[in-house]
Amino acid sequence: MLIKSQRLTLFSPLLSKTRRIPVNSHQTLVAESVITRRTLGAITATPSFHKNPVVIRRRIKLERVTRNCVRIDREIDEEEEEEEKERGDLVKQSIWEQMKEIVKFTGPAMGMWICGPLMSLIDTVVIGQGSSIELAALGPGTVLCDHMSYVFMFLSVATSNMVATSLAKQDKKEAQHQISVLLFIGLVCGLMMLLLTRLFGPWAVTAFTRGKNIEIVPAANKYIQIRGLAWPFILVGLVAQSASLGMKNSWGPLKALAAATIINGLGDTILCLFLGQGIAGAAWATTASQIVSAYMMMDSLNKEGYNAYSFAIPSPQELWKISALAAPVFISIFSKIAFYSFIIYCATSMGTHVLAAHQVMAQTYRMCNVWGEPLSQTAQSFMPEMLYGANRNLPKARTLLKSLMIIGATLGLVLGVIGTAVPGLFPGVYTHDKVIISEMHRLLIPFFMALSALPMTVSLEGTLLAGRDLKFVSSVMSSSFIIGCLTLMFVTRSGYGLLGCWFVLVGFQWGRFGLYLRRLLSPGGILNSDGPSPYTVEKIKSI
């Protein structure tokens, strides 16, 4: 068998002559080069091939490998592009699914929030058809009745959280005990408010008018004395409603409030328009509707398998637990209600017609305001499981906030347009007094600016409450209240009138929006903290 051989030419600057080394075609070139280097020491071997079949085959293999690598790389790029596109589609789909879930959840809740202001708005519309003095008297009347009831929303927060926690532990007995304790607290608070209204109602109305517009004091006092009879029913019904929400039952409370709204509307129509009872008739209609609503709330709770007529005295430890959860929320709500009330307080010194115009715009604003509150409730219901615990998912929480902000911005614009159009284009719905209508039209611009920010602001606030950033929320609200009240005093004394007061309200809303947004977008915010959550199950038992 013949073995073909070739000669390998070696060049070296250390050798004057060229040396040829035979190389068999079936031998490995690399090994031969290693042997040559070992033999010649520092001599470098540089092979020179001329149409070597082995080299040609290796080049062909190299080209094939290169082509395969290029093809595989191209396929990988295409797959990455497809995956990125799919991720984008999933993000869009996730946002869309979340938005649909939000709308489905907030539907019944929105109806519940609307019923209360709707009853006050019905009173405003009906009374406005008769007397301008009684319409102005509704200003301090609604503050001492409706606005004060919102101060007790801390009972609602405590009830829904504590009941939801007990049900999560599948401890129905504990849930029943907590409902009984909170029903007792609601009853005691209601009786105290009834007593305070009876004893200090006339003094409160007189102090609210600051010795001016004395003509509205008798009508306003009559209104709050009648409405005050419903205080125990209002707060007991509030606890029953919140317990149902903690059980994720929103239809029962919605039916109760819808029935109350219908009763209030029929009562106002019969007592005020047909029987001429005026503001007293409106107060009796609202009181009756609230009593019926409380009974239906408790009946709905009984249908869930709980005893809504069981009351239990809380222990000191239970009172401390409730106060620790509810105190920051109480400060926040109290600051907000106090600021709105202070605007009415400033308006009482500007004349009866100005106060009546503010009453109309304030009731319309409050009616539109509650449309955004379910977004806050949604954040408090869906965010906790994403922010801490075993199912912590910060990207999903950020996506949920994005969905809430999209809905909030859209809702704010819609509410701003509709809320401005009704008093602007159809003021006769509220009153036929030309002076009052003129004052209403002056407030349309700040009315739109303040209303458009509300849904987004409450979405951010609800997210912070879900993340248990309670100290920050309460500090923002309390500081905003102080700064806002000082600004209102300056504006009133400087002669800017009711228009200046409403622009202070614009600053109050947009200032809170900016502070909340900055807090959530900060690197150490609850939506951007990649470290372990500081809120463990042991520390937070009311989630």
UniProtKB/Swiss-Prot annotation:
Q: What is its main location?
A: plastid
Topology versus the membrane: Multi-pass membrane protein
A biological process from GO: response to salicylic acid
Q: Where in the cell is it found?
A: Plastid, Chloroplast membrane
Q: Which Pfam families match?
A: MatE (PF01554)
Gene Ontology MF terms: antiporter activity; xenobiotic transmembrane transporter activity
Q: Which GO terms describe its cellular component?
A: chloroplast envelope; chloroplast membrane; plastid
The residue span given for the transit peptide is 1-30
Q: Give the top-rank taxon of the lineage listed in the UniProt record for this protein.
A: Eukaryota
- Induction info: By salicylic acid, UV-C light and pathogens.
Sorted alphabetically, which keywords does the UniProt record give?
Answer: Chloroplast, Coiled coil, Immunity, Innate immunity, Membrane, Plant defense, Plastid, Transit peptide, Transmembrane, Transmembrane helix, Transport
TM regions (residue ranges): 107-127, 135-155, 181-201, 228-248, 256-276, 278-298, 319-339, 342-362, 406-426, 443-463, 472-492, 497-517
Q: In which tissues is it expressed?
A: Preferentially expressed in the epidermal cells.
Phenotype caused by lack of the gene: Enhanced susceptibility to several bacterial pathogens and alterations in PR-1 gene expression. No salicylic acid (SA) accumulation after pathogen inoculation and more susceptibility to both virulent and avirulent forms of Pseudomonas syringae and Peronospora parasitica. Age-related resistance (ARR)-defective. Defect in stomatal response during bacterial infection.
* Residues in coiled coil: 55-94
Q: State the family named in the UniProt similarity comment for this chain.
A: Belongs to the multi antimicrobial extrusion (MATE) (TC 2.A.66.1) family.
Q: Describe its function.
A: Functions as a multidrug and toxin extrusion transporter in the export of salicylic acid (SA) from the chloroplast to the cytoplasm. Plays an essential function in plant defense via the pathogen-induced salicylic acid (SA) accumulation. Also acts as a key component of the Age-related resistance (ARR) pathway.
Q: Which PANTHER family match?
A: PROTEIN DETOXIFICATION 44, CHLOROPLASTIC-RELATED, PROTEIN DETOXIFICATION 47, CHLOROPLASTIC
Q: What is this protein called?
A: Protein DETOXIFICATION 47, chloroplastic
- The protein's organism comes out as Arabidopsis thaliana
UniProt lists the gene as DTX47
